[in-house]
Amino acid sequence: YYDFLSLKTNVSESRKEKARWALVIGDVMGKGIPAGLLMTMLRGMLRAEVLTGLPPDRILHDLNQLAINDLDQSHRFVTLFYSDFDPRTKKLRYSNAAHNPPLLWKNAEQKIIKLDTEGFVLGLQKDAQYNCCEIKLQDNDLILYYTDGVIDSSNALGERFDEDKLIKVLSKLCKQSYSSQEILNKIFKKLDDFTGQNRHLEDDASIVVFQLR
């Protein structure tokens, strides 16, 4: 699951004003219709919660409070990474509920850092607390959001396309100044080549690429 949400809550605001955006990626434990229904429910809760304008850590805290009974009854949990970006200040705030940390390519420094912060999965602990971090982005910085289906994919020898492999592939592509769409396509091509064209991914593999221009 991934989503993009406009955080402009005042309908009278000028259309020319740049609104903040929320970028979210998450994964529910399990597969099939029950997991899909839970994620749909959570998506609705999240879309209502973001309109409060609260910081990411409070968003995750409140979302956990809202969803914990349904998740507990289904014996499932959810990992979720929530971030919001302000194009006026170029600042990204983020909070993590035990999801795979997105990879940030810092173009000026030619290196990748992980956007990680402590936080418990949604649905297991009612009083779970979350941290909020903030980072300022620069032009041509790029963030790769992904689900664990990417790095848990394996080839015929049982080798995993792990986080280290993903970082190496992303770093090489970013250094060649590809567009965000080209990077997305080439990563999936690398994944197909690694697992074999006829092999099915063991879990859903979702990737979102956000590039600042």
Specify the residue positions occupied by each region the protein language model found.
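Flexible loop/N-cap segments at domain edges
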Residues: R20, V24
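Active-site-proximal, acidic helix/loop segment immediately C-terminal to a metal-coordinating Asp/Glu
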Residues: I33-G53, I113, L137-N198, E202
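Amphipathic alpha-helical coiled-coil segments that mediate homodimerization
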Residues: Y1, I59-L66, I183, I187
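DG-centered beta-turn motif at the end of beta-strands
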Residues: D27, H99, T147-G149, D204
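Catalytic core of PPM/PP2C metal-dependent serine/threonine phosphatase domains
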Residues: I33-Q110, D116, Y130, T195-E202, ...
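Acidic loop->beta-strand submotif enriched in PP2C/PPM serine/threonine phosphatases
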Residues: Y2-S6, N10-K18, V78, I113, ...
